[in-house]
């Protein structure tokens, strides 16, 4: 049975769990690549009572094939694990592979996902209605320093099992793969390989459609992200909601804030798009853990909540200005106070507090800001200085946009 056209001159790490897929991959790769250019990587989570049997199968196979083997043994009280086991295990596994890659200076990783895995992944993506970068599984992807190759994506599970059983090659059976409390296992139990051709056609069409959407998204973002802020143009609201959702999702990725959407991306992005499309408000805020997403007139940006915390100091005399570092523009404010010299003064970013009690140019501050469309970024981040007695704001209000 032939694998895809693998580069035989490269060196590879191989992820081998001891299950049929990875054992099949290993037994075939050694026929194509010099064994000295291979390093087998195995992770024993000690999650199942029989996990040591998996490790033994891998160890014996590597001895038989004269291959280098690296093992990560994890001993953990899984009752204390607060996150999804599969997600956690994947991170542990791939971080281990990345560490071994650095040790051997081999950054090509082979993993044994097969055609059934590809189909399962696609059907799971449809059920979850996730925003994905690709439907199914990519033949080549990346993780940190690793280039991850999947050479078995054209091979069915039945072909793998037939090969191993015919050649009397031992492999481990993961009992948790039949536990239908996991959604992937439910899908697996209903798969019929006779339907794969039809489903593959659906996947190809879905990815072609996705590529068309990505072109629209990439073009919009290329022209509308400035200083990590997203411009909300008229063109954006002419797009369908699928495109807008993907623009928001990709925006988070481009500003390296994708982690704020983990485990909540679908619900959160839908909420954001719903607000964008349906709300006429110039300003709104959505909390995302320790950050907030803020709509500010025709801008959208992400900011740490700590930066939004209001700061206020009282200046009763010149001594209170000495070594003052609370605000970045304190030198500018000092000059204003030194020129006015009518103590006491308030310096603050507490917009909700000062907007209704102060004035600018004989107008209530709140009305002044509204009339001049002063950005909320300015209102929330830029300090103002005013006299406690007459409550007139003395510094010029600079627009952020």
From Swiss-Prot:
One term under GO cellular component: cytoplasm
InterPro entries tied to this protein: Rossmann-like_a/b/a_fold, TilS/TtcA_N, tRNA_Ile_lys_synt, tRNA_Ile_lys_synt_N
Protein name per the record: tRNA(Ile)-lysidine synthase
Enzyme class: ligase
PANTHER family: TRNA(ILE)-LYSIDINE SYNTHASE-RELATED (PTHR43033:SF1)
Family stated for the protein in its record: Belongs to the tRNA(Ile)-lysidine synthase family.
Any one GO biological process: tRNA modification
A Pfam family this chain is assigned to: ATP_bind_3
GO molecular function list: ATP binding; tRNA(Ile)-lysidine synthase activity
Catalytic activity: cytidine(34) in tRNA(Ile2) + L-lysine + ATP = lysidine(34) in tRNA(Ile2) + AMP + diphosphate + H(+)
EC number: 6.3.4.19
Residues the entry annotates as binding ATP: 17-22
């Amino acid at each position: 049975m032939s694998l895809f056209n693998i580069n035989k001159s490269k060196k590879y790490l191989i992820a081998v769990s001891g299950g049929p897929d990875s054992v099949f991959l290993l037994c075939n790769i050694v026929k194509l690549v010099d064994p000295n250019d291979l390093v087998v990587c195995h992770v024993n989570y000690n999650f199942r009572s029989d996990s040591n049997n998996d490790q033994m199968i891998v160890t014996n196979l590597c001895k038989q094939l004269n291959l280098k083997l690296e093992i990560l043994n994890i001993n953990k009280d899984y009752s204390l694990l607060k996150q999804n086991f599969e997600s956690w295990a994947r991170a542990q596994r791939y971080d281990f592979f990345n560490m071994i890659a650095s040790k051997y200076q081999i950054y090509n990783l082979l993993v044994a996902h097969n055609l059934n895995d590809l189909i399962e992944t696609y059907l799971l993506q449809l059920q979850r209605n996730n925003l994905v970068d690709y439907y199914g599984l990519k033949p080549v992807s990346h993780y940190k320093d690793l280039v991850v190759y999947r050479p078995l994506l054209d091979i069915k599970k039945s072909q793998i099992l037939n090969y191993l059983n015919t050649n009397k090659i031992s492999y481990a059976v993961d009992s948790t793969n039949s536990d239908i409390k996991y959604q992937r296992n439910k899908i697996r139990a209903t798969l019929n390989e006779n339907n794969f051709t039809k489903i593959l056609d659906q996947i190809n069409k879905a990815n072609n459609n996705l590529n068309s959407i990505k072109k629209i998204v990439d073009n919009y973002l290329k022209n509308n992200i400035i200083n990590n802020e997203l411009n909300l143009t008229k063109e954006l609201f002419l797009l369908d909601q699928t495109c807008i959702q993907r623009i928001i999702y990709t925006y988070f990725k481009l500003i390296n804030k994708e982690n704020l959407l983990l485990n909540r991306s679908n619900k959160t992005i839908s909420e954001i798009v719903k607000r964008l499309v349906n709300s006429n408000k110039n300003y709104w805020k959505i909390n995302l853990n320790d950050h907030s997403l803020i709509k500010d007139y025709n801008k959208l940006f992400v900011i740490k909540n700590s930066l939004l915390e209001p700061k206020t100091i009282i200046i009763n005399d010149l001594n209170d200005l000495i070594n003052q570092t609370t605000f970045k523009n304190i030198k500018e404010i000092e000059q204003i106070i030194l020129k006015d010299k009518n103590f006491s003064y308030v310096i603050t970013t507490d917009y909700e507090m000062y907007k209704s009690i102060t004035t600018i140019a004989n107008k209530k501050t709140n009305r002044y800001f509204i009339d001049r469309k002063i950005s909320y970024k300015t209102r929330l981040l830029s300090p103002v200085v005013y006299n406690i007695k007459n409550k007139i704001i003395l510094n010029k209000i600079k627009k952020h946009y």
